[in-house]
Amino acid sequence: MEKDNYFLENFTSHDGKNLVIHHWPVEKPKMLIHLVHGMSEHGYRYHDFAKWLNKKGIYAYAPDLRGHGKTAGSMEDIGLFSIKNGWNKVVKDLKGITEKFSSKNPNIPTVILGHSMGSFLTRSLIIDFPETANHYIFSATASHPGLKGYLGSFIAKSNSLLFGEKTKSRLLQLLVMGEFNKKIKKPKTRKDWISRDESVVKKYINDPYCMQVFKNQFFVD
């Protein structure tokens, strides 16, 4: 039976915020890879991928970002980075986490792989702190959405002012994610866009960390 090398760690970030990090270590790694998850998911969703990386001699780790997974602290706190400067705080989180593991493993190359929202955060990290990692990978990234993006930003800021930063917004969630399933022919669920593997889709739908409605200030960020 394969030895389970997975464990969790608490990390105190730059402003004192506690972050939960998922680890999949290997002895004498030839590479470190920092997995940055997307919106409405969490680090442990990458467990199978991380175990595959382990077989290649790669040490993988994935934090639950602010407002996500175990870092959120409770289900009610999912869906919000922070009341102020949330995006920048998360970017600094990624910098601090990466530097910690790089310093513990000198002379071993570090890769940051950002998926979806995580790819946007990683792109911000490169702009602000380009020397953080040796290599970067963007998965399911995108270009500027144009008019739709400006409209969404206006709605997010208006909703945040009118209804409060911590109020959940199904409208904004629909604007961000509602188009994805339309590209799937004969979908069986509203989350078929997650994967062509039906078991992965089912697991996502049944994961309470993945099915929460996010809050106005998150969309402002």
Where are these regions (language model features)?
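N-terminal cap/lid segment of alpha/beta-hydrolase-fold proteins
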Residues: 1-28
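Active-site glycine-rich loops that stabilize anionic/oxyanionic intermediates
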Residues: 30, 38-41
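The conserved beta1-alpha1 loop
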Residues: 34-38, 64, 115
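Conserved alpha/beta-hydrolase
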Residues: 45-76
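Alpha/beta-hydrolase fold nucleophile elbow
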Residues: 105-116
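Glycine-rich nucleophile elbow surrounding the catalytic serine of serine-hydrolase chemistry
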Residues: 114-124
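Alpha/beta-hydrolase-fold enzymes
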Residues: 122-209
